[in-house]
């Protein structure tokens, strides 16, 4: 049986998650990409709690132009950095969730770095 793109992504995700884990001092910034929206959340793996979350779905109601493109993904990165700053989170571990570090995933990372997150 041939492997689909999504199956390959899931294998990469498992391989990546073996190597990285978020802690209380340095939580994990997870990015998920669907066909319509980009989601980002900061997770503390020690407690299993989501500390901060946002998406183009949430931002789109507040700002025009927050679509599922690079510009919208960059807005998600800046928003997650702003929300993390409110919870005094400065350093995170970036989890690309099996996606290639390109396009919208890279735009989220660049936006988060511009917003002040370190990774």
UniProtKB/Swiss-Prot annotation:
Biological processes, Gene Ontology terms: translation
GO cellular component: cytoplasm; ribonucleoprotein complex; ribosome
Signal peptide location: none
MF terms in GO: 5S rRNA binding; structural constituent of ribosome
Alphabetical list of PANTHER family matching this protein: 39S RIBOSOMAL PROTEIN L18, MITOCHONDRIAL, LARGE RIBOSOMAL SUBUNIT PROTEIN UL18M
Described function: This is one of the proteins that bind and probably mediate the attachment of the 5S RNA into the large ribosomal subunit, where it forms part of the central protuberance.
Presence of keyword rRNA-binding: yes
Subunit structure of this chain's protein: Part of the 50S ribosomal subunit; part of the 5S rRNA/L5/L18/L25 subcomplex. Contacts the 5S and 23S rRNAs.
Pfam families the UniProt entry points to: Ribosomal_L18p
HAMAP family cross-referenced by the UniProt entry: Ribosomal_uL18_B (MF_01337_B)
The entry's keywords: Ribonucleoprotein, Ribosomal protein, RNA-binding, rRNA-binding
Record protein name field: Large ribosomal subunit protein uL18
InterPro entries found in the cross-reference section: Ribosomal_uL18_bac-type (IPR004389), Ribosomal_uL18_bac/euk (IPR005484)
Family stated for the protein in its record: Belongs to the universal ribosomal protein uL18 family.
């Amino acid at each position: 049986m041939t492997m689909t793109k999504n199956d390959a992504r899931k294998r990469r995700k498992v391989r990546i998650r073996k190597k990285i884990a978020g802690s209380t001092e340095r939580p994990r910034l997870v990015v998920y990409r669907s066909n319509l929206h980009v989601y980002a959340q900061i997770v503390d793996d020690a407690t299993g709690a989501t500390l901060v979350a946002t998406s183009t779905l949430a931002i789109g109601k507040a700002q025009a132009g927050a679509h599922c493109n690079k510009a919208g993904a960059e807005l998600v990165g800046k928003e997650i950095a702003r929300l993390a700053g409110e919870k005094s989170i400065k350093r995170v571990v970036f989890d690309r969730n099996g996606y290639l570090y390109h396009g919208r995933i890279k735009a989220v990372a660049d936006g988060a770095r511009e917003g002040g997150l370190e990774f």
